[in-house]
Amino acid sequence: MAKKVVALIKLALPAGKANPAPPVGPALGQHGVNIMAFCKEYNAKTSDQAGMVIPVEISVFEDRSFTFVLKTPPASVLIRKAAGIEKGSAQPNNQKVGSISRDQLKEIAQTKMPDLNANDIDAAMNIVEGTARNMGVTIND
């Protein structure tokens, strides 16, 4: 018989740096999950992506066991890294803070493809381009 899911927890944690301190501890602790076991497993799976923020979806079962699914890093993080900027623009319409090429945009779209609601790479590129535009990042052809 399948185990019953009692909670679905979504967190965005730095790759390879999960620890029992907030936000991990309180989120998992209230469901009775072994926090250290999660931290060790998460850090092992994300150690190759150091410096990125990796969203994770944790399913907690009634016997207090858990499984988790790693998502792709947020588009804004990938765009910031590609453009070499610290943060997006406060006024994206007036103040441009950086630029990325079409090739970089396509690369980001391919990375994000599994998590996007897009049928092909062009649709994914449009989604990522919209995010870039809202951050004050221009796309060069």
Swiss-Prot record:
Keywords: Methylation, Ribonucleoprotein, Ribosomal protein, RNA-binding, rRNA-binding. CDD domains: Ribosomal_L11. One of its GO terms (molecular function) is large ribosomal subunit rRNA binding. Pfam families: Ribosomal_L11 (PF00298), Ribosomal_L11_N (PF03946). InterPro entries: Ribosomal_uL11 (IPR000911), Ribosomal_uL11_bac-typ (IPR006519), Ribosomal_uL11_C (IPR020783), Ribosomal_uL11_C_sf (IPR036769), Ribosomal_uL11_CS (IPR020785), Ribosomal_uL11_N (IPR020784), Ribosomal_uL11_N_sf (IPR036796). GO terms for cellular component: cytosolic large ribosomal subunit. One or more lysine residues are methylated. GO terms for biological process: translation. The keyword Membrane does not apply. Part of the ribosomal stalk of the 50S ribosomal subunit. Interacts with L10 and the large rRNA to form the base of the stalk. L10 forms an elongated spine to which L12 dimers bind in a sequential fashion forming a multimeric L10(L12)X complex. HAMAP family: Ribosomal_uL11. Belongs to the universal ribosomal protein uL11 family. Forms part of the ribosomal stalk which helps the ribosome interact with GTP-bound translation factors. This is Large ribosomal subunit protein uL11. It comes from Crocosphaera subtropica (strain ATCC 51142 / BH68) (Cyanothece sp. (strain ATCC 51142)).
